[in-house]
From Swiss-Prot:
Coiled coil regions in record: none
Protein name (record): Catalase A
Region (Disordered): 1-25
GO molecular function, one term: catalase activity
SMART domains named among the record's database cross-references: Catalase
Gene name of this polypeptide: katA
Cofactors demanded by this protein: heme
PANTHER family hit by this protein: CATALASE
Active site: H55, N127
Pfam families associated with the record: Catalase, Catalase-rel
Keyword terms of this UniProt record: Heme, Hydrogen peroxide, Iron, Metal-binding, Oxidoreductase, Periplasm, Peroxidase
């Protein structure tokens, strides 16, 4: 016992008794002066922090990014040069479920990566699918509301989901992926990851290239059917956490092959689709993926709350050689993610150890709640403004990226005008074999249980525009699963 550390209060005072409250007699009331009890209860009341608005349920691990290819002609980013090895953190998640949700629900999976580079943190905050449900961020809150609980019933609403999707044809690509085999991976290790957005590379010559990031699982793709997923949930609600944690604990380190698609800057003027549209992919035949490295996860967190729940990923975190694009949803996420962290974790969330850069940090931000770095980070207390004459941090012109080409008049443009929301879905549907199509149809039918007929018919019209077989297959699956028969097609459906 003499070798064990002494329990103390948070102020450092030794605690003589950690078993009994301070009372007036053995049966008496609690004394208000029992500051040890008050402190213990007060801390318990504050153990939980607000959960993420989306991607609340997550699992994570540490590892490394090793660059084996050569893309130095496209980017000056040091972490992407041949032979570079960068420590990193990955967090996988579901989108809709709360922290207590089951892991094996059909949902898009988050695939968020934080690279601790010598030039600052680089965050790539993607999903396990290359597209998403929206192309304009103005609709993101509305879409997420359909994935969360109904304000009156406090239940998930299939009606809300399909009503929104049927009124938003740009969602069809992601809906098709979600309802396919890819919508329910067996584990985080058996799915791909994608940056999803279009980013950019820029090199020392000031040349810009558009880029998409892909992370292809080396463990192979493994998926569950709805019935298999339900069986797993009946045994454990933490299947993803268990599989990831114990694989790493047992030395079975998961790996992903890192690939990039690269598009010359001026190619955006000749592609038949908008390369910055989050609902679209770049055809591999036009822009073949180039293998550049390997992502490996090899260390579990020592404390889940400190290192995974406190982790803050933001697309705004980039490094020299990597830039943004006119992708509208990316532009909004640059603001919204960092802002969400300031609400959830506090003004100085980047000073939480798991979020701290591994390189020197100097800036003129000061004060604020939970300021733990001594007021300012300039190295000189007299240099608390800029410009100054006291050797405070100075700007680095060499980090300036080349100009980004933009044009056009300011307006609220209809994002559906000029966009074909069916051609790429048709190409994807054509890749499915008969078994995959059958499961797609039955998954959609299962998800439509209880949805009003006019909403179903409106969605079936979208499926028909992709391919007649798509619409017919879902209609037959609806009849088999629910006895669904359309009496008439409503005005709304038309």
């Amino acid at each position: 016992m003499t070798d064990r550390p002494t329990i103390t209060t948070t102020a450092g005072a030794p605690v003589p008794d950690n078993q009994n409250s301070l009372t007036a007699g053995p049966r008496g009331g609690i004394m208000l002066q029992d500051y040890q009890l008050i402190e213990k209860l007060a801390h318990q009341n504050r153990e939980r922090i607000p959960e993420r608005v989306v991607h609340a349920k997550g699992w994570g691990a540490f590892g490394s990014l090793k660059i084996t290819g050569d893309i130095s002609q496209y980017t000056r980013a040091k972490c992407l040069q041949p032979g570079a090895e960068t420590p990193m953190l990955a967090r996988f998640s579901t989108v809709a479920g709360e922290q207590g949700a089951a892991d094996h629900e059909r949902d898009v999976r988050g695939f968020a990566l934080k690279f601790y580079t010598d030039e600052g943190n680089w965050d790539l905050v993607g999903n396990n699918t290359p597209v998403f449900f929206i192309r304009d961020p103005y609709k993101f809150p509305d879409f997420i509301h359909t994935q969360k609980r109904h304000p009156k019933t406090n239940l998930r609403s299939a009606t809300a989901m399909w009503d929104y999707w049927s009124l938003s044809p740009e969602s069809l690509h992601q809906v098709t992926i979600l309802m396919s085999d890819r919508g329910l991976p067996q584990t985080p290790m058996h799915m791909n990851g994608y940056g999803s957005h279009t980013y950019s590379f820029w090199n020392d010559a000031g040349e810009r290239y558009w880029v998409k990031f892909h992370f292809k699982t080396q463990q192979g793709h493994k998926f569950f059917t709805n019935e298999e997923g339900e069986a797993v949930i009946g045994k454990t609600r933490e299947g993803y956490q268990e599989s990831l944690f114990y694989a790493i604990e047992n030395g079975e380190f998961p790996r992903w092959t890192v690939q990039v698609q690269i598009m010359p800057e001026l190619d955006v003027e000749k592609t038949p689709y908008n390369p910055f549209d989050l609902t679209k992919v770049w055809p591999h035949a036009d822009y073949p993926p180039v293998e550049i490295g390997v992502l490996e996860l090899n260390r579990n967190p020592e404390n889940y709350f400190a290192e995974i729940e406190n982790a803050a990923f933001s697309p705004s975190n980039i490094v020299p050689g990597i830039g943004f694009s006119p992708d509208k949803v990316l532009q909004a996420r640059i603001f919204s993610y960092a802002d969400a962290h300031r609400y959830r974790l506090g003004t100085h969330y980047e000073h939480i150890p798991v979020n701290q850069p591994r390189c020197p940090v100097h800036h003129y931000h000061r004060d604020g709640q939970m300021n733990t770095y001594g007021g300012i980070r300039t190295g000189n207390p007299d240099a608390y403004y800029e410009p100054n004459s006291f050797n405070g941090p100075a700007e680095q012109p060499l980090a300036k990226e080349p100009p980004l080409r933009i044009d056009g008049d300011m307006s609220r443009y209809d994002h559906r005008v000029g966009n074909d929301d069916y051609v790429q879905v048709r190409a994807l549907f054509g890749l499915f074999d008969e078994g995959q199509k059958s499961r797609l149809f039955s998954n959609i039918a299962a998800a439509m249980g209880g949805v009003p007929g006019e909403i179903i018919e409106r969605q079936l019209i979208h499926f028909a525009r992709v391919h007649p077989e798509y619409e017919a297959g879902v209609r037959q699956a609806l009849k088999t699963a629910h006895g669904y028969e359309a009496d008439t097609i409503s005005t709304a459906a038309e």
